[in-house]
Curated annotation (Swiss-Prot):
Protein name: Large ribosomal subunit protein uL13
Lineage: Bacteria, Pseudomonadati, Pseudomonadota, Gammaproteobacteria, Lysobacterales
UniProt KW Ribosomal protein keyword: yes
General function of this protein: This protein is one of the early assembly proteins of the 50S ribosomal subunit, although it is not seen to bind rRNA by itself. It is important during the early stages of 50S assembly.
PROSITE patterns (UniProt xref): RIBOSOMAL_L13
Length: 142
């Protein structure tokens, strides 16, 4: 008997809709990363992308515990001398709430070409509207 290895072209990829309202950022992100990798499937193979597509709505309504709203910092560098920009989680949620979830999930995925492919299957929207109704996503309760 040989070991089963999933083939990328035969993997069944489903679309799921996740409502982030009232969910904790870290706990939500770990489950999203797990499903993007495909670890919830019995056909999971480490070197093959077996994950599903995830549509996350209501990103502006996520919850964090403790003082993370003021203490957690996001840094970005423009490339110019002295232009290291820093903003708190509270400011980031006001400016672009969907990017907070994207950054958290991206850090939990593998670094490399396959990780980037997995990351592209994550669609995050700040409101309750999304343009993926044609894919008929199933509601996923996390």
């Amino acid at each position: 008997m040989t070991t089963f290895t999933a083939k990328s072209e035969t993997v069944q990829r489903d679309w799921y809709l996740v409502d982030a309202a009232g969910k904790t950022l870290g706990r939500l992100s770990t489950e999203l990363a797990r499903r993007l990798r495909g670890k919830h499937k019995p056909v999971y193979t480490p070197h093959v992308d077996t994950g599903d597509y995830l549509v996350v709505i209501n990103a502006e309504k996520i919850v964090v515990t403790g003082n993370k709203l003021k203490d957690k910092k996001y840094h970005r560098f423009t490339g110019y001398i002295g232009n290291l920009k820093t903003e708190s989680l509270e400011q980031a949620l006001q400016r672009h709430p969907e990017r907070v979830i994207e950054i958290a999930v991206k850090g939990m995925l593998p670094k490399g070409p396959m990780g980037r492919t997995m990351y592209r299957k994550l669609k995050v929207y700040s409101g309750a509207e999304h343009p993926h109704a044609a894919q008929q996503p199933q509601v996923l309760d996390i």
